[in-house]
């Protein structure tokens, strides 16, 4: 079951002056690489909405930069206090975007960039929040599998679960009206230029 965004939470974000950009797509498609470059090049105008998660940090990940790493109890407390715009559970781990993360960016005149999964996208779409939705797609499901296996960060079961989830996300992206822009990441430079143009547009 997909958690629902409460009206009290949504009302706090309806008045955003800068339209957030929601970037979604299968795990391993290259979102992190493109977004890190985007924020490095345009950190004065754009800001990454750092999500909360209960999962264990991967090698090289830093708390407060890649994610806010919290315990399950801490995460559940934030859910109960309606601190999240959206939240979801995947592979036993919880992920969420806090209201404060977006508000802090708005306060310094930066457009919020959200990297969330399909569950989160559906929650934000069901709210009054006016956002722009960008789907980042792999050249093929086969190439996505190669990328996932090449990372070497997960076991076979986790990889198969991510591939199953990727198929559902791609199926969702193929339906008219479910996104504002589709970018196929078959050429990193080309994909970056497309994403850059979208995020910098008014």
Curated annotation (Swiss-Prot):
Keywords assigned by UniProt, alphabetized: ATP-binding, Kinase, Nucleotide-binding, Transferase
Domain Guanylate kinase-like residues, every copy: 18-200
Reaction catalysis annotation: GMP + ATP = GDP + ADP
Keyword set includes Lyase: no
The organism's place on the tree of life at top rank: Eukaryota
GO biological process: GTP biosynthetic process; purine nucleotide metabolic process
Coiled coil: none
One GO CC term on file: cytosol
Any single Pfam family the record assigns to this protein: Guanylate_kin
InterPro entries xrefs: GK/Ca_channel_bsu, Guanylate_kin-like_dom, Guanylate_kinase, Guanylate_kinase_CS, P-loop_NTPase
GO molecular function: ATP binding; guanylate kinase activity
EC number: 2.7.4.8
Binding site for ATP: 25-32
The protein's role, per its UniProt record: Essential for recycling GMP and indirectly, cGMP.
Assigned protein family: Belongs to the guanylate kinase family.
Name used for this protein in its record: Guanylate kinase
Gene source species: Schizosaccharomyces pombe (strain 972 / ATCC 24843) (Fission yeast)
């Amino acid at each position: 079951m997909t958690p629902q965004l409460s009206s009290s939470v949504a009302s706090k974000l309806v008045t955003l002056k800068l339209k957030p950009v929601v970037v979604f797509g299968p795990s391993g498609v290259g979102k992190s690489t493109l977004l890190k470059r985007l924020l490095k090049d345009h950190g004065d105008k754009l800001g990454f909405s750092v999500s909360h998660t209960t999962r264990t940090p991967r090698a090289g990940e830093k708390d407060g930069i890649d994610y806010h790493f919290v315990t399950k109890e801490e995460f559940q407390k934030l859910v109960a206090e309606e601190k999240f715009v959206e939240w979801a559970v995947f592979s036993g781990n919880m992920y969420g975007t806090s209201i404060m993360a977006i508000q802090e960016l708005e306060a310094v005149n930066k457009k919020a960039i959200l990297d969330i999964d399909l569950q989160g996208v559906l929650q934000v779409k069901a709210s009054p929040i006016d956002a722009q939705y960008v789907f980042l797609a792999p050249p093929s499901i086969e190439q996505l599998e190669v990328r996932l296996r090449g990372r070497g960060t997960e076991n076979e079961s986790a990889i198969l679960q991510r591939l199953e989830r990727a198929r559902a996300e791609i199926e969702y992206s193929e339906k008219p009206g479910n996104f504002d822009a589709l970018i196929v990441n078959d050429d990193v430079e080309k994909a970056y230029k497309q994403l850059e143009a979208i995020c910098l547009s008014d």
